[in-house]
Amino acid sequence: MKVNVSCSSVQTTIDILEENQGEDESILTLGQLRDRIATDNDVDVETMKLLHRGKFLQGADDVSLSTLNFKENDKIIVMGGKNALVDDAGFKMLMQYEKHNLSNLQKAYDLNLRDVADLERGFLEKPKQVEMGKKLEKKVKYFNEEAERHLETLDGMNIITETTPENQAKRNREKRKTLVNGIQTLLNQNDALLRRLQEYQSVLNGDIPE
């Protein structure tokens, strides 16, 4: 049976009273329902209230959901403050890495982009353009190597321990994913910049007509 959960502006669906699911996934009691909603919505399980058909769901954690008159697609409204997650050691590690390393990576790409654009303007004599193009090609290729090293470093970071709460662990994983996606975006942009530079070098070398 599916029930719809509304927490602030977020809508989710939960399967309840499905005994054929794995033991860890089955939601048969009020306590299991509370825990699932708290995990999905980052809500404090101790202070949240669940409103169902105009009444608050009350009772011990072992109360069976089958006694609470749920019907298919019933709506549960979650009332309660969000958990105030702290920046634990893993999250702080990611924040520090972003501040001291990844911001510089963005600056390096922006500089390469500007230098390639300056080269394409053709203000320098041709021999100097050729020389500058070779130097830029090395810089642009080095950027990829540096970005790959950052990806390896992020992948190897121990941002979750045995004592990390699940909601904090989820937050840490999402933060790392955001950083990884940002680096991969820069890598894609840098690959396009390298192709652009190499095409201009081909023009300078006479391989492609101007």
Curated annotation (Swiss-Prot):
UniProt domain Ubiquitin-like: residue ranges: 8-85
GO molecular function: adenyl-nucleotide exchange factor activity; ATPase activator activity; protein-folding chaperone binding
Residues of the BAG domain: 108-194
Gene3D superfamilies the record matches: BAG domain, Phosphatidylinositol 3-kinase Catalytic Subunit, Chain A, domain 1
Keywords attached to this entry: Chaperone
Pfam families in alphabetical order: BAG, ubiquitin
Transmembrane annotation, as ranges: none
SMART domains associated with the record: BAG (SM00264)
Any one GO CC term of the record: cytosol
PROSITE patterns recorded: BAG, UBIQUITIN_2
Biological role: May inhibit the chaperone activity of HSP70/HSC70 by promoting substrate release in an ATP-dependent manner.
UniProt name for this protein: BAG family molecular chaperone regulator 1
Organism: Caenorhabditis elegans
